[in-house]
């Protein structure tokens, strides 16, 4: 009978839905963190919300709060997870500068995989165990290099701030390219603007336009980091 067939179809749908539900992996902090990172990698940090994570996991926002306190807690977990990927060397008094530089480059590369995520690093106190592991490692390297304790402590903060700001700037460029359909100010365009300036008003900018616009890849990052690190040796 038609009614029976309809009932059978509904039963099959319910059975299929129950089977799919039973096969769905249980919610965990690890799944939440990985889902959040996937969202940031694909759409940027600003797209990350608790509701978005819940929707991607096919659950309700309330379910997340059994594992994550709030968005700030999620941000701290994300930074902690990225810090866990950083390889710490054994402090070496002979190569401490290169060791610190390498750690900064590792952090940079992790953050750049997830556009805008350095905002989370700027907004949290480093209390996550993995973030503290990284801070402990950096402190050990600086102390091994003969940097005074107070200078080393503040240097960690200064170096971290630069890495975060650098990655945030790169993320903003990427976002601008996506928003404006790929349009950005190219090196040649910027050179042209500087060269077109009035020599009476901007004689130095016009004269040193090539130097002001020089650099490829992470050249400027390398320069800034090495300048700061080398300066620590004078203390």
Locations of regions flagged by a protein language model:
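N-terminal intrinsically disordered/low-complexity leader segments
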Residues: 1-27, 202-211
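A structured, mid-to-C-terminal "fold-capping" secondary-structure block
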Residues: 2, 181-235
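Amphipathic alpha-helical interaction segments
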Residues: 31, 73, 102, 133, ...
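Helix-turn-helix
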Residues: 31, 35, 39-73, 77
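Short, basic, alpha-helical segments at the C-terminal edge of helix-turn-helix-like DNA-binding modules
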Residues: 81-85
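Hydrophobic alpha-helical connector segments
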Residues: 87-133, 149-152, 156
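Hydrophobic alpha-helical bundle segments that form small-molecule/ligand-binding pockets
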Residues: 134-160, 166-191, 213, 232-235
């Amino acid at each position: 009978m038609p009614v029976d067939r309809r009932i059978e179809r509904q039963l099959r749908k319910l059975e299929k839905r129950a089977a799919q539900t039973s096969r769905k992996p249980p919610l965990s902090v690890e799944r939440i963190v990985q889902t959040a990172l996937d969202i940031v990698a694909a759409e940027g940090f600003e797209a990350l919300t608790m509701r978005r994570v819940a929707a991607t996991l096919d659950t309700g926002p309330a379910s997340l709060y059994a594992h994550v306190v709030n968005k700030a807690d999620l941000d701290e977990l994300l930074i902690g997870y990225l810090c866990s990927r950083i390889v710490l060397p054994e402090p070496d008094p002979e190569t401490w500068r290169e060791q610190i530089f390498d750690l900064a480059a590792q952090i940079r590369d992790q953050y750049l995989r997830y556009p805008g995520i350095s905002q989370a690093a700027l907004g949290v106190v480093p209390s996550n165990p993995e973030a503290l592991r990284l801070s402990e490692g950096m402190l050990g390297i600086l102390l091994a290099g003969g940097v005074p304790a107070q200078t080393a402590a503040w240097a960690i903060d200064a170096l971290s701030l630069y890495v975060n700001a650098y990655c945030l700037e790169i993320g903003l460029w990427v976002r601008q390219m996506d928003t404006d359909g790929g349009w950005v100010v190219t090196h040649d365009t910027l050179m042209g603007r500087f060269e077109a300036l009035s020599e009476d008003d901007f004689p130095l900018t016009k004269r040193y336009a090539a130097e002001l616009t020089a650099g490829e890849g992470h050249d400027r990052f390398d320069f800034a980091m090495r300048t700061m690190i080398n300066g620590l040796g004078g203390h």
